[in-house]
């Protein structure tokens, strides 16, 4: 093959005159450019680390300080109180003619020491300021005097033009809550779902735990909190994710969707080219720390540690425990198409390929007529197998096909060029969205490399999607990247009138490299077994997408309520109607206010929420009575959410106590019971408009339809939701078809009914009032209400397969 000749930089040969070496100038040039890029990257990383280390100060502040000291010295003033003279005495004596140089060096050393002390003081002061969470606990719109003072001080100490990791040294550590408070909150959270007998027994176990073991476990936990960056996040990653032996597919991955109404181009290769270029632009900005840190209220920074592993990252399977492999750089992506794997370079001559050049390379892969090797088509099903099984097979695969395996695992990310279309269609909008969600979550079980940090999925009609492995980071991080990608590839890079990427192709680029897998016979049976298991798991998932458009965030805002709390309480009503009982409910809340914080659980099924649900199902209760109970439930949920965000949650603390007890070989019936609980309703809100790269009000059809995840329990639901602009909410519901207790479509109908019933309690929502509140009768008005969102502009930009 032609590219094989470019694999080496010289060719030795033996002649009658001796050995000769023929150097290849193009390859040597590539080696030089690659080394130059590597050195530039190292220098850039060093400089950025220096800038973030001295933040909120800057190198200019050192120069100002040094100049001030020199000026004072020139005016025969000694701001060092004699220290500079002592420093001069310690410097070598180079003779009288260099006496002035010694003074300058002494001033520079003193300025550096003083500058370092000031930086340390700023770090400590900012860390103390950021440890204040009173602002979080105050009612929305009612800012107290201490909070106003705090905001002013944060502005003073925060510096200017922060880089992505500028605040990392100043973030406070996550506090260890009081074990008595945690146990009390836990008992309060399970009271609505336990019988009196079960609750009394749980309370006895809790008191026994507090009396016998809690103080010892808490002591070890506090010791870790003083030593480690975060007392729980590393254990959460290890024991919840990396030590789990379940398949990643459905159990530990989640998906993100493209624009709901718009597909910028129907050309698969063009969409892939722009998307990959946008993703690598994001990586470039990430490496240079040009992405600004996320700030709450425009002032309070969130931890940025999770951004480090977005790209060049793979979860490597192990027999007992996986590990995360992260490379500093990668100049290729791994591509899967029609059962074949390709290694496609993303850079040429030290520069990122243009979108048009990337489109050209993807088109070459699409046009490649070569068939898949035996069992190559289903090879990726191994990544959907139980982790221990995949680890054993990978050991053999690494021996037999090391080069191909390294090309996939060492890629910046994985790209799957699917042969089928996806997205919203005119013929059957509901079914098409459900199929779209299922394709992103599980695919066919063998067309995603689930170990990669994320897989970019490009469908045949140009629709995009993302499948994300969960261990390395949480949804807001990948959502931030995805938001940048969609906005950049559509609004900044754009497409020509014929749907191609802008620019010109590069015919000099080598063909993408087809990966060769030398698969031994013993692996064939493992692949077949993994494929069978992946298909069973994939076909068992029931995905349902509910675009609800009768009202959205603007209506909830007019009711003066938290939009997230509004949805959470409505979900309790919907789930009760679906199952006839209350259950443990998991809502993910972020703890990135702290260094290396990840998530905390909000236990949304509260006593207050249950009281509201019972009132809604009681025909004797009036609307004002239900509304009063609803407001109480919302206030309680808000209090729990704020407590979780400020490090005063329940579940991460109990989890860490349980891990310590296992290390100490202590048996705690209470912690064992807590650890064995099943979350039958797992929920999460998908963040949106984190970067504000375009105004969604001016482009209402360019809204992402969010994403979803699999259920946490075999007899439970996974529900995610996203506020699309001001007038639409999209729900992603998942469950297991094998369960006789769940039905994603049924819950979707209950969610729509519950939203309308709750809205009808408010004066602004009287037009939603229905005759039989709580009856579960279908209201067809909102079944296809989202179709009215389509505008003339969006119609013109949609492909034939889109609505």
From Swiss-Prot:
Its main location: other. Changing residue 474 to A: Loss of palmitoyl thioesterase activity. Keywords: Acyltransferase, Cell projection, Disease variant, Endoplasmic reticulum, Fatty acid metabolism, Hereditary spastic paraplegia, Hydrolase, Lipid metabolism, Membrane, Neurodegeneration, Transferase, Transmembrane, Transmembrane helix. It holds the Pfam family CPT_N. GO terms for biological process: carnitine metabolic process; fatty acid metabolic process; regulation of postsynaptic membrane neurotransmitter receptor levels. Its EC number is 3.1.2.22. Residues 788-803 have a biased composition (Polar residues). Residues 1-52, 127-803 are cytoplasmic. Expressed predominantly in brain and testis. Expressed in motor neurons. GO terms for cellular component: AMPA glutamate receptor complex; axon; dendrite; endoplasmic reticulum; endoplasmic reticulum membrane; glutamatergic synapse; postsynapse. GO terms for molecular function: acyltransferase activity; palmitoyl-(protein) hydrolase activity. It comes from the Eukaryota. The chain crosses the membrane at residues 53-75, 104-126. Gene3D superfamilies: 6.10.250.1760, Chloramphenicol acetyltransferase-like domain (3.30.559.10), Choline/Carnitine o-acyltransferase, domain 2 (3.30.559.70). The active site is at residue 470. It is a multi-pass membrane protein. CoA binds at residues 552-564. Signal peptide: none annotated. (R)-carnitine binds at residues 586, 588, 599. It is linked to Spastic paraplegia 73, autosomal dominant: A form of spastic paraplegia, a neurodegenerative disorder characterized by a slow, gradual, progressive weakness and spasticity of the lower limbs. Rate of progression and the severity of symptoms are quite variable. Initial symptoms may include difficulty with balance, weakness and stiffness in the legs, muscle spasms, and dragging the toes when walking. In some forms of the disorder, bladder symptoms (such as incontinence) may appear, or the weakness and stiffness may spread to other parts of the body. CPT1 enzymes are comprised of an N-terminal regulatory domain and a C-terminal catalytic domain that are separated by two transmembrane helices. In CPT1A, the regulatory domain, termed N, adopts a malonyl-CoA inhibitory and non-inhibitory state, Nalpha and Nbeta, respectively, which differ in their association with the catalytic domain. Belongs to the carnitine/choline acetyltransferase family. PANTHER family: CARNITINE O-ACYLTRANSFERASE, CARNITINE O-PALMITOYLTRANSFERASE 1, BRAIN ISOFORM. This is Palmitoyl thioesterase CPT1C. It comes from Homo sapiens.
């Amino acid at each position: 093959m032609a590219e094989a000749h470019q694999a080496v930089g010289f060719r030795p040969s033996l002649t009658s005159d001796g050995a000769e070496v023929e150097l290849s100038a193009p390859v040597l040039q590539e080696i030089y450019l690659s080394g130059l890029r590597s050195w530039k990257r190292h220098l850039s990383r060093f400089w950025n680390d220096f800038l973030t280390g001295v933040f909120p100060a800057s190198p200019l502040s050192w120069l100002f300080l040094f100049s001030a000291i020199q000026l004072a010295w020139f005016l025969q003033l000694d701001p060092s109180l004699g220290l500079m003279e002592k420093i001069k005495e310690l410097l070598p004596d180079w003779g009288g003619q260099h006496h002035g140089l010694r003074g300058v060096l002494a001033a520079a050393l003193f300025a550096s020491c003083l500058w370092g002390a000031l930086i340390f003081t700023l770090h400590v002061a900012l860390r103390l300021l950021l440890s204040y969470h009173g602002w979080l606990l105050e009612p929305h719109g009612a800012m107290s005097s201490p909070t106003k003072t705090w905001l002013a001080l944060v502005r003073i100490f925060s510096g200017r033009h922060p880089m992505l990791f500028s605040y990392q040294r100043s973030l406070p550590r996550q506090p260890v809550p009081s074990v008595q408070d945690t146990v009390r909150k836990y008992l309060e959270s399970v009271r609505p779902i336990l019988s009196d007998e079960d609750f009394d027994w749980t309370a006895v176990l809790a008191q026994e735990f507090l009396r016998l073991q809690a103080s010892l476990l808490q002591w070890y936990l506090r010791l870790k909190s003083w030593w480690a960056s975060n007392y729980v996040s590393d254990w959460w990653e290890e024991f919840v994710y990396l030590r789990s032996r379940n398949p990643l597919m459905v159990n530990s991955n989640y998906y993100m969707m493209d624009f709901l109404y718009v597909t910028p181009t129907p050309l698969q290769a063009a969409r892939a080219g722009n998307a990959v270029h946008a993703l690598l632009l994001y990586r470039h900005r990430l490496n240079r720390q040009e992405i600004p840190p996320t700030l709450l209220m425009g002032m309070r920074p969130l931890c940025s540690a999770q951004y480090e592993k977005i790209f060049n990252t793979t979860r490597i399977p192990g027999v007992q425990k996986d590990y995360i492999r992260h490379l500093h750089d990668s100049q290729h992506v791994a591509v899967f198409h029609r059962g074949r794997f390709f290694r496609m370079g993303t850079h040429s001559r030290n520069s990122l390929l243009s979108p048009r050049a990337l489109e050209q390379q993807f088109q070459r892969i699409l046009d490649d007529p070569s068939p898949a090797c035996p069992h190559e088509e289903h090879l990726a099903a191994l990544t959907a197998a139980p982790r221990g099984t995949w680890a054993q097979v990978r050991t053999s695969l690494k021996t037999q096909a090391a080069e191909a395996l390294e090309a996939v695992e060492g890629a910046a990310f994985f790209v799957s060029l699917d042969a089928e279309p996806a997205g919203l269609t005119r013929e059957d909008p509901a079914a098409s969205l459900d199929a779209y969600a299922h394709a992103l979550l599980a695919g066919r079980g063998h067309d995603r490399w689930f170990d990669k940090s994320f897989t970019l999925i490009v469908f045949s009609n140009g629709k995009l999607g993302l499948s994300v492995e969960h261990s390395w980071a949480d949804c807001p991080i990948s959502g931030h990247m995805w938001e940048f990608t969609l906005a950049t590839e559509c609004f900044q890079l754009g497409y020509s009138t014929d749907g191609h990427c802008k620019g010109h192709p590069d015919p000099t680029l080598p063909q993408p490299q087809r990966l060769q897998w030398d698969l031994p016979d013993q692996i064939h049976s493992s692949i077949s077994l993994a494929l069978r298991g992946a298909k069973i798991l994939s076909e068992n998932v029931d995905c349902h997408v509910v675009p609800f458009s009768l009202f959205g965030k603007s209506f909830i805002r007019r009711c003066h309520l938290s939009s997230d709390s509004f949805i959470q309480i409505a979900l309790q009503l919907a789930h009760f109607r679906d199952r006839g009982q209350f259950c443990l409910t998991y809502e993910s809340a972020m703890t990135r206010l702290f260094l290396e914080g990840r998530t905390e659980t909000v236990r949304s099924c509260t006593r207050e929420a249950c009281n509201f649900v019972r009132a809604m199902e009681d025909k004797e209760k009036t609307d004002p009575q239900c509304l009063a109970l609803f407001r109480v439930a919302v206030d309680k949920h808000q209090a729990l959410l704020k407590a979780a965000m400020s490090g005063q949650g329940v579940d991460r603390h109990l989890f860490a106590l349980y891990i310590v007890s296992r290390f100490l070989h202590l048996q705690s019936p209470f912690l064992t019971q807590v650890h064995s609980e099943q979350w039958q309703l797992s929920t999460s809100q998908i963040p949106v408009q984190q970067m504000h790269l375009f105004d969604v009000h001016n482009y209402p059809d360019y809204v992402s339809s969010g994403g979803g995840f699999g259920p946490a329990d075999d007899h439970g639901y996974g529900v995610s939701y996203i506020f699309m602009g001001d007038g639409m909410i999209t729900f992603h519901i998942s469950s297991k078809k094998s369960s006789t207790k769940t039905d994603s479509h049924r819950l979707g109908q209950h969610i729509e009914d519950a939203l309308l019933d709750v809205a009808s309690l408010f004066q602004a929502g009287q037009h939603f009032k229905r005759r039989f509140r709580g009856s579960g009768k279908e209201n067809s008005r909102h079944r296809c209400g989202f179709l009215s969102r389509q505008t003339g502009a969006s119609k013109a930009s949609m492909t034939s397969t889109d609505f």
